[in-house]
Amino acid sequence: MTLICLKTYLRDCQKKSLCYRDLMLVKLDTFEKTTKNKAMKQHAIVVGAGFGGLAAAMRLGVKGYKVTVVDKLDTVGGRGSSVEKGGHRFDLGPTIITMPHLLEELWAFCGKRFSDYVNLKAKTPFYTITFPDGTRFHAQQDESKMREEVARLFPNDLKGYDRFMLDSEKRYEFAFSSTDKIGRLPMQRLWDTLKVIPKFALMRADRSVFANAAKFVKDERLRMALSFHPLFVGGNPFKVTSMWGLVCHLEKTYGVHYAIGGSVSIAKAMSKVIVEQGNELRLNTQVDEIITSAGKVSGVRLSDGKEIRADIVISNADSGHTYGSLLKSTKKKRWTDGKLKRQRWSMGLFVWYFGTKDTRSLWKDVDFHTVVNGPRYRGLVNDIFVEGKLAKDMSLYVHRPSVADPTAAPKNGDTFYALSPVPNLGFKNSVDWRQEAEPYRQRVQETLEKNLLPGLSDHLTESHIMTPLDFKERYLSPFGSGFSMEPRMFQSAWFRPHNISEDFPGLYLVGAGTHPGPGVPGVLASAEIVAKLIPDCNSEEKIKLKANNLEKSI
């Protein structure tokens, strides 16, 4: 309508023998300024300064929105934040970055270069997997070296391994290889999922990740090495859809990377871009409620009772917390309290962060990442996900960032992170971590001294632990789960909480609890999806496009 009126106005001016070109330029200038002012009046609130929330804020900044990011913590990063004790920096959450091009694309969208903000280093091997029989399997990006490793340890499974990797590639190509694949598109309509079911059926997506690996290789150790990746996103390898088998190809193609300064350095860089865009971050600010008016989201209410009005709200809080707590006083049709309780939630995490002194020259065979397998795989996973009990044995994921990043620890010292998958708090008679935390930490220490870090107790300097109880309190994660809803077949795509709320216009979701799911690539993709869904008619790019089209049409 604005363009039609402008054309009519200019034709009238031409009839009056006024300078047509000059009038056009004046009107275009007025049009741009007016539209820019409208854009700046559109306010978006992002609840949560995790990777998903920060990425969404960056994208909305480009689209012309006034953005306010609020977070209850005193630092950015959410699960990707860090703490410092005695000169040791402990990364609390993700320790590796896969698919770094997603970060590069995000920065490019903002007209910037990621490498100007963050120093990302490739790591190889990705991780060393140890087994009780003494076997050490080095997973790495170089295809020929990886095949040599498989041939050395599992010679009868080399051909099966090759077939498995081809299968992994097909899954990746189908689900996540580009912006037009299901992992990077909105799944708002049931039809979006139904139309890909034939392809899912062809790839036997109904099989678990472990069952799919077992189809190709026979050695139980190699089956474990090719199927444990769902644990990185809180899933049961014996239940999670085989589509997650794509991770093996993803690692081979893009490698595994580490950010110098820890993952929190990425979050800080994202925050810097947001501020450069003229937008705001408010830490130590807890949102108690997302408020609605006439059925539409209209802002948030803070814990101090103050309200912040907004045109749209993007929640980076766990989707269970968003619908179960932040919208507690509002009637919901789909994600009711009852439905949330029926969901299967990801496992809990026990993480022991510890510092050592005079160890930089010790434990030469302990690199950046080590997976220490206990005597059981299926049985331990069953105890965690099905029985909900704290097993006597354990498997550990050990991170030693100081071998690659001197800033992580004092001189000659080391910083470590030992993660043990444990049950979440949703079981009857769930673990009382107030009583069990220290005894369990001691068991973790004993396991490390026996299997990986002999003499550890003689070098300990700092200690910090997190349990599912901390995840519940610090991150407001339902049942203290580490990764929101478990990424099972019928808790994925359309079946997962949507990126745009089904119940409340103006509410959008990013992060692990929405589509496409947990993991750094997943939460970055969720922000990309939300940016596609949010109207961009007042963005800077759209303003210029309208002006250019207007000039051509006159």
Where is each model-derived feature located?
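N-terminal glycine-rich phosphate/pyrophosphate-binding loop and immediately adjacent elements
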Residues: K41-E173
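Rossmann-like flavin
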Residues: P132-K239
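A glycine-rich dinucleotide-binding beta-alpha-beta segment and adjacent secondary-structure elements
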Residues: D219-V233, A391-H399, P454-P516
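Helical element adjacent to the flavin cofactor pocket in flavoenzyme catalytic cores
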Residues: L246-V297
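Mid-domain catalytic core of redox enzymes
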Residues: Q286-P410, E551
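Active-site-proximal substrate-binding core of FAD-dependent oxidoreductases
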Residues: T292, D536-I554
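C-terminal segments that line or cap access tunnels to active or ligand-binding sites in enzymes
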Residues: T359-F471
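A conserved FAD-binding loop/helix module that cradles the flavin
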Residues: T514-I534
